Structures are given as C-alpha cells and as structure tokens.
Curated annotation (Swiss-Prot):
<protein>
    <recommendedName>
        <fullName>Aspartate/glutamate leucyltransferase</fullName>
        <ecNumber>2.3.2.29</ecNumber>
    </recommendedName>
</protein>
<dbReference type="GO" id="GO:0071596">
    <property type="term" value="P:ubiquitin-dependent protein catabolic process via the N-end rule pathway"/>
</dbReference>
<dbReference type="InterPro" id="IPR017138">
    <property type="entry name" value="Asp_Glu_LeuTrfase"/>
</dbReference>
<dbReference type="GO" id="GO:0005737">
    <property type="term" value="C:cytoplasm"/>
</dbReference>
<dbReference type="InterPro" id="IPR007471">
    <property type="entry name" value="N-end_Aminoacyl_Trfase_N"/>
</dbReference>
<dbReference type="InterPro" id="IPR007472">
    <property type="entry name" value="N-end_Aminoacyl_Trfase_C"/>
</dbReference>
<dbReference type="GO" id="GO:0004057">
    <property type="term" value="F:arginyl-tRNA--protein transferase activity"/>
</dbReference>
<dbReference type="InterPro" id="IPR030700">
    <property type="entry name" value="N-end_Aminoacyl_Trfase"/>
</dbReference>
<comment type="function">
    <text>Functions in the N-end rule pathway of protein degradation where it conjugates Leu from its aminoacyl-tRNA to the N-termini of proteins containing an N-terminal aspartate or glutamate.</text>
</comment>
<dbReference type="Pfam" id="PF04376">
    <property type="entry name" value="ATE_N"/>
</dbReference>
<dbReference type="InterPro" id="IPR016181">
    <property type="entry name" value="Acyl_CoA_acyltransferase"/>
</dbReference>
<keyword id="KW-0012">Acyltransferase</keyword>
<keyword id="KW-0808">Transferase</keyword>
<comment type="similarity">
    <text>Belongs to the R-transferase family. Bpt subfamily.</text>
</comment>
<dbReference type="Pfam" id="PF04377">
    <property type="entry name" value="ATE_C"/>
</dbReference>
<dbReference type="GO" id="GO:0008914">
    <property type="term" value="F:leucyl-tRNA--protein transferase activity"/>
</dbReference>
<keyword id="KW-0963">Cytoplasm</keyword>
C-alpha cells in the first residue's frame, strides 16, 4: 500500500480512526485512515489520493486501515480496453432510451425519494434506509473536488419530464472518473447498475480519461464483488496497480 508520505501531499495529515463495525463483512471490525484537513483536498490532490487507494464520502477522504484484514481492494477499469460480457451488452442495449443529464451537485426532492426507495429495497436495515435530508446531503452533495450529479430518465412527453430511473455521483480526476455512489429504481430485472457503470465507462472515453475508478472490490461481499465483472480491470495490490487475469 502506498504510504501517504510518498505522495505530493506534504501539507496533509493522516490519522487512523477507532475501530467500528464493518459495513460489508458481518462480525468484523473496521478502521479507516483519514486525510485531513479537508479544505486542502482539492481536485488535484484528490486525484493523487484516489490513485493511492483513497475514496470520498462527502468531505471525508479515507481508505481502509483495518487490523489484520486486507479484503477491501481498490479496483479500476482501463476504459479503452473494456470488453463487455454478453449480459453487460444486453443491459446496455436495454436502456439505450434513457436520457442522461449532467448537473451540479444539488438537492432534488425526487432524487431523495428515489434514494430512500433504493435503500429500503436493496439495503434495508443497514441504517441508510432511514437517512434524513441532512444525512443524504452530507453524504452525496458536499464536495470540494470536481463532482457531477447525473440523472437518467425515460423520455418525457411534451414539457413533462420522463420517469427518473438512476442518479449517479461522479468525481472527475486527472486520470479518470471516480464513481462515488449510484442509486436507482430497485427493479432487479432492469440491470440499472450494470447499465450505469457502462455509461460511466463510455463517458470516461468521451472525456479522454483512461480509467474508471469503481472503489473497493470485496470478494466476500455480494454488494461489492460485482465490480470484478467489468473486465479487464486493475487492482491496487502492494501499492501497485496490477492488471488481473480474466475470471
């Protein structure tokens, strides 16, 4: 794992949190290494942090720092080499009618309602299904880096907007896009999550950026293991990004 002192981040300080219950693996305790102060973490600095395995949650920039556990593995997709599977191509084709709108970070009641539906159906009992407006805003709508909100809708009729299907938060980095969080209409048959990752890959290509950073892959967590289905991909192992063989 890259040490923070090896990064051009001399003004930042890093501290380890106290242990807390792991969100992904039952009966495990987790710790995080946090980069501070947050007001010094601009788009340039954050790009270096993401390349070193950090992620962002609101103003909170962190990476796993767990005792005796290295299950969280940063994963990124080299977008120009991406080769979709048959099921991924099917999901892409299924939702070609969706219309993407790139927006600044802002609170939209319809987005928040979709977020709560998604959490209640996909992650019920995890705590986020009861997030208040303030918690939602702090988690997704606060940023000091180059962030975008993208909403995906069905085609509208006249002046009426179409049905909202997906909302995604992205950070634009020096060398790629970073997928912060995505939520969508919780219909398992629709493969909205797969479609959205493929849209992000296509968007990175369009912007001339080589990578899509998907966050942490956790093999033992169904919520996180899907990321390795996007191939080829690279994982940050021992401080070096390494291309992984096809599974």
């Amino acid at each position: 794992m890259t040490h923070p002192k090896e990064l051009p981040l001399a003004q930042l300080q890093f501290y380890a949190t106290a242990p807390y219950p792991c969100s992904y693996l039952a009966d495990r305790m987790a710790r995080s290494q946090v980069a501070t102060p947050s007001h010094l973490i601009n788009a340039e600095t954050y790009s270096g942090l993401v390349a070193a395995g950090f992620r962002r949650s609101g103003m909170f920039t962190y990476r796993p720092y767990c005792d005796g556990c290295q299950c969280c593995v940063p994963l990124r997709v080299p977008v120009n080499d991406f080769a979709p599977s048959r099921s991924q191509r099917r999901a892409w084709k299924q939702h070609q009618g969706l219309q993407a709108r790139v927006m600044r970070l802002c609170f939209v009641p319809e987005h928040y309602a979709l977020y709560l539906r998604y959490q209640n159906r996909r992650h019920a009992g995890g705590g986020m299904d009861e997030d208040s407006v303030d918690q939602y805003t702090q988690f997704l709508l606060q940023s000091r880096v180059n962030s975008r909100l993208v909403e995906f809708r069905e085609p509208g009729i006249g002046d009426q907007p179409g049905a909202l299907r997906i909302v995604s938060i992205l950070d634009v980095l020096n060398d790629g896009l970073s997928a912060v969080y995505t939520f969508y209409e919780p219909d398992p048959a629709c493969s909205y999550g797969t479609y959205n990752v493929m849209w992000q890959i296509a968007q990175a290509r369009e912007l001339g950026l080589p990578y899509l950073y998907l966050g942490y892959w956790i093999e033992a967590s169904a919520k996180m293991a899907y990321k390795s289905l996007f191939q080829p991909h690279e994982m940050l192992l021992g401080g070096t990004w390494q291309r992984q063989p096809a599974r």
